[in-house]
């Protein structure tokens, strides 16, 4: 019983507050930073498989991730209201892009965004599907997950 009382005595004394509070604040700060980095800014992961193909992916649960620089030359149209949650980029042995899957979330009306993509892709049917910089591009919306899927496959 005396040991519990001595711990509270340590907390109430002026000189020893720093001994307890500084490490406690440091641990709390590290914990909050790890939560922040895990949920908001997913880091890109690069995985190389045995056959020589490579997969680049990133995911964010709360925030938005940025597309990798390798996709800058494709100039993929991303609607202003879409927040990218995750992406997968598959590369062949020669580091050429073979397919891209981008999943986005938005608070805007799904039909409005799908119609925007239909205009961009000059789609003539009901689907937002067309050709973009040498890739077959398909944009769809899932009611269940409330996610937009933007898929590009090499022609």
Task: Specify the residue positions occupied by each region the protein language model found.
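An acidic-aromatic pocket/loop used at catalytic or ligand-binding sites
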Residues: 2-155
């Amino acid at each position: 019983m005396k040991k519990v009382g001595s711990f509270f005595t340590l907390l109430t004394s002026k000189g020893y507050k720093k001994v307890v509070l500084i490490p406690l604040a440091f641990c709390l700060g590290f914990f909050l930073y790890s939560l922040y980095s895990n949920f908001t800014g997913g880091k890109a992961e690069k995985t190389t498989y045995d056959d020589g193909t490579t997969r680049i992916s990133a995911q964010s649960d709360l925030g938005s991730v940025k597309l990798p620089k390798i996709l800058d030359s494709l100039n993929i149209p991303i609607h202003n209201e879409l927040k990218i949650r995750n992406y997968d980029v598959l590369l062949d042995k020669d580091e050429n892009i073979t397919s891209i899957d981008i999943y986005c979330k938005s608070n805007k009306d799904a039909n409005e965004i799908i119609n925007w993509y239909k205009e961009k892709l000059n789609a003539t049917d009901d689907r937002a599907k067309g050709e973009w910089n040498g890739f077959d591009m398909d944009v769809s919306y899932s009611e269940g997950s409330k996610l937009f899927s933007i898929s590009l496959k090499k022609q």
